């Protein structure tokens, strides 16, 4: 039981931690103290539902559909490419502008819409929750499967609320930091986590020989949320 829960928690964190569109949005809401708890809560709820679906049968259904798998994989490639280009353009045009100079405050409806957008329109979320966490957890017996799903969900709760509250605590420092240096710092911080998650996926492929994992690693070895 302990080994299963440890695997569920660490694998859950490994899937979530690398900074991508979803995490970056949670971070930005925390920095600006703009409905950050609402953003974190909505991200957690989406993860809880998707992890549950994946662990209790959704992963097997998706793995049996080559077309669906291909759409998710290439959708993830395109989404990651778009997000990377958008971030680079934003950093280039900012040219040292301070975060405090553009508060980017949003209303509740806008925050809800953006959070759902960067979550449910992000193919990496489905790859992480439905495919990878789901396929790993579905191999356990029923009682262990429930424990795995629970601690994977707990990892999501811990991460998103830590990210939101951490951004609030660090917001005075981050607000004084220039955009270029802030983004470089974020990149340096998340690079080890990115590699950690790639190793987890390679381990899943080697140990459990899931037919879809080698395909994902070959096409795009570092998905970011």
Swiss-Prot record:
The chain crosses the membrane at residues 1-21, 37-57, 65-85, 116-136, 150-170. It comes from the Bacteria. Its main location: membrane. One of its GO terms (molecular function) is amino acid transmembrane transporter activity. Signal peptide: none annotated. It is found in: Cell membrane. Keywords: Amino-acid transport, Cell membrane, Membrane, Transmembrane, Transmembrane helix, Transport. One of its GO terms (cellular component) is plasma membrane. It is a multi-pass membrane protein. The keyword Cell membrane applies. PANTHER family: ARGININE EXPORTER PROTEIN ARGO (PTHR30086), ARGININE EXPORTER PROTEIN ARGO-RELATED (PTHR30086:SF20). Belongs to the LysE/ArgO transporter (TC 2.A.75) family. This is Putative amino-acid transporter YggA. It comes from Aeromonas hydrophila.
């Amino acid at each position: 039981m302990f080994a299963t829960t440890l695997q569920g928690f660490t694998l859950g964190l490994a899937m979530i931690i690398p900074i991508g569109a979803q995490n970056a949005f949670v971070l930005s809401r925390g920095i600006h103290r703009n409905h950050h708890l609402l953003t974190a809560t909505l991200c957690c709820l989406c993860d809880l539902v998707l992890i549950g679906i994946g662990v209790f049968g959704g992963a097997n259904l998706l793995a049996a559909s080559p077309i669906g798998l291909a759409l998710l994989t290439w959708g993830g490639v395109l989404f990651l490419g778009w997000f990377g280009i958008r971030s680079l353009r934003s950093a280039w045009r900012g040219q040292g502008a301070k975060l405090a100079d553009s508060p980017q405050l949003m209303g509740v409806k806008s925050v809800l819409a953006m959070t759902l957008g960067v979550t449910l329109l992000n193919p990496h979320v489905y790859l992480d929750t439905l495919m990878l966490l789901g396929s790993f957890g579905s191999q356990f017996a029923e009682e262990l499967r429930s424990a795995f799903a629970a601690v994977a969900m707990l990892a999501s709760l811990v991460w998103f609320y830590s990210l939101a509250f951490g951004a609030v605590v660090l917001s005075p420092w981050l607000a004084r930091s220039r955009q270029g240096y802030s983004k470089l710092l974020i990149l340096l911080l998340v690079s080890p986590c990115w590699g950690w998650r790639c190793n987890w996926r390679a381990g899943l492929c080697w140990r459990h020989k899931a037919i879809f994992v080698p395909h994902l690693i070959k096409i795009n070895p570092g998905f970011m949320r």
